[in-house]
Amino acid sequence: MSAVEVGGAWTERPSILAAPALEASAEKRSLLILKWFLLSLKRQFYIGGGEALKKPLNPFLGELFIADYTDGDATAHLVTEQVSHHPPITAAYMWDEAHGIHGSGYFRVEMVFNSGFGSGAASGLGIDLRQYGHALIHIDRFDEDYLIPAAQARVKGFLSGQLYPELIGTSHIVSSSGFISEIQFSPPAKSGGWLKWPRFGGGKDQRNLFKAVLYRRDDPKRTPLYVIAGQWSGAFTITHCESGRVIETVELSAGTPAVPAETLPVEEMDPLETRRAWKPVIEAIRKGDMADTSRQKARLEDAQREKRTVEERTGAKWEPLFFQKLEGKYELFERLGSATSWPLEQELTDGVWVVDEQKVQKMKRSFRPDSILVE
């Protein structure tokens, strides 16, 4: 699948996404947002939902993914768009109008070879997947915002021939109600100050470990209110610190199943929608025909180059359909990001990308009748 579908990680568990909007306690809402974030990670980094690492297709400029996700009493909607090709930036917007929760974000992924020397958290030969960007979630009922990180990852397993992603470093989620979640990925080389890393299932596979703590922003001691620890790709526990009780054990494969994306039939999609645009390529990949895969990819890429050539010749300026660059100060990011000295890094993402909600709500196919795409 194309990288524009990775945004489905946010919405494939609609009831988990909606849960914070139903919770009266600001502290517990922050915990539920943290839980939602952790549950989204496997889909983001194990592309296709399997246990092996797969590289997604590189989106073309203007590529779209539009889908709904429903489980129980919750329905989440998702629109993602490739808003830049150089550098490659994917923007996403999700919403659940019934529960009054919505969010948008933009991300750039850069692959960098790393020898693994000189960093305890990133030890071992691998490729760094450096992510730039962030997301913001808003809960209408409480007029509350959450700043969501882009986790950093490494591709490991080159020596064994079994590649897998390993998240590294420390990430934060910051809420406007005064709580911070701090997430440390992978056992640090010297785990001073950390509790013993848990082992789930009795097996030897201890990849994808993490530990997260939730504390108050105004607490200089950062006293943990909750600790979540385990495997972000498997199972983890949530512990209430004051009582010492494990209040929940979360298992991705059992207790919190993801639901598939609901989309139009491929033949009814706009030519810019990813599953229609890439259909010949996907079919060739499934047949194992690498020669035809290369031919089909070349056809699509050549069509895109022709479109860019026409725009350059006519002086036409390409603009995204549903997102735009922010003009002026980014006050919400500055207010939340200052809690952890969070850098914006807008020079690495060709600016700050925000959704135009009115355009999303008024969307109507066909989106760009003059688009040059192969069928």
Predicted regions and their residues:
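Extended acidic, Ser/Thr- and Pro-enriched interaction/regulatory segments
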Residues: M1-L22, E27-E375
